[in-house]
């Protein structure tokens, strides 16, 4: 189980089981990953639009430097759940989801824990959320 920037453990299971969440995006990223940072404006827009409709993001950082990870989250205004165990690709979550490269993401339906979509980049995430949650 990875920790947030305050050092508190936050499990994906607890986020998926939270009754206010209908869909959770499990997002793997790192501050040093250029393509990951390109996704941030899309994630921010979709989070703002759909969070109150039951959408949550559980972001797992592959950073190994705590300060760089936290500073990037603050600078980019990534105000959703952020966790890291600061071990890079060696995190158990990466192994569980067979993540070989980033960015990588999985959209999980919380009612049954099923992955309903993967690799939703750019406008694709917003389009999928609109389909699932409405405008």
Task: Show the residue positions of the predicted features.
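A short beta-strand-turn-helix
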Residues: 2-24
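Extracytoplasmic/secreted envelope proteins and their assembly/folding machinery
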Residues: 13, 40, 44, 66, ...
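Hydrophobic beta-strand anchors of alpha/beta hydrolase catalytic cores
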Residues: 25-26, 57, 105
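Conserved redox-active cysteine motifs that mediate thiol-disulfide chemistry
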Residues: 28-45
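Short, solvent-exposed mixed-charge patches
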Residues: 29, 134-135
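Solvent-exposed loop/turn segments at secondary-structure junctions
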Residues: 30-34, 63-66, 88, 122
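Conserved segment of the thioredoxin-like fold in thiol-based oxidoreductases
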Residues: 48-102
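Thiol/disulfide oxidoreductase modules built on the thioredoxin-like
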Residues: 78, 85-134
């Amino acid at each position: 189980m990875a920790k947030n920037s305050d050092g508190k453990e936050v499990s994906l299971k607890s986020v998926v089981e939270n009754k206010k969440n209908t869909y959770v995006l499990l997002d793997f990223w790192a501050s040093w990953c250029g393509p990951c940072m390109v996704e941030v404006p899309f994630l921010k827009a979709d989070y703002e639009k759909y969070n109150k409709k039951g959408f949550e993001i559980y972001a797992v950082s592959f950073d190994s430097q705590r300060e760089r990870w936290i500073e990037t989250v603050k600078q980019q205004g990534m105000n959703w759940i952020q966790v890291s165990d600061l071990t890079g690709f060696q995190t158990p979550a990466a192994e569980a989801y067979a993540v070989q490269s980033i960015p990588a993401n999985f959209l999980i339906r919380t009612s049954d824990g099923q992955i309903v979509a993967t690799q939703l980049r750019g406008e694709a995430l917003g389009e999928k959320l609109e389909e699932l949650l409405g405008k």
